[in-house]
Amino acid sequence: MSTNVFDPPALEKGTLRVIPLGGLGEIGRNMTVFEFDGKLLIVDCGVLFPEEHQPGVDLILPDFEPIRDRLDDVVGLVLTHGHEDHIGAVPYLLRLKQDIPLIGSQLTLALVEAKLKEHRIKAYTLTVEEGQEEQVGPFDL
């Protein structure tokens, strides 16, 4: 039995777990983790912009804590499009583990690479076209 709220029970082989880390009930911080056969695939990694009642706050990041000790299990980060609420937190995630492959369209990856350049981070990227299928770890994209 799990005693830590961030330590969910073990999955049976072949079972998919979906872990939303942001973006639910808010416009921003979009980040969802899919777990399958011990591997993690992240979809989006965005920021939330603060509201007027949050002076001094520049950006609000997704909560990386549930996956912080599992970053070696991450097989990729799929970026659906280039809006800040989907890509804005990528540099902060890559500061924790820089070799996570980024997967997205040519335009989306160009926007992310410009952002990463500001942070002096060089990422491994995989450009995909519409309709293209890829195998990333145990995940079929």
Language-model features: locations:
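Metallo-beta-lactamase
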Residues: 1-19, 35-46, 107-141
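Intrinsic-disorder/low-complexity coil detector
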Residues: 7-8, 19, 61, 100, ...
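Catalytic core of the metallo-beta-lactamase
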Residues: 14-22, 27-36, 133-141
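Short beta-alpha junctions and helix-cap segments that line functional grooves
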Residues: 20, 29-31, 89-90, 112-113, ...
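Pre-active-site segment of Zn-dependent metallo-hydrolases
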Residues: 24-29, 36-79, 91-100, 104-108, ...
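N-terminal Rossmann-fold NAD(P) dinucleotide-binding loop
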Residues: 86
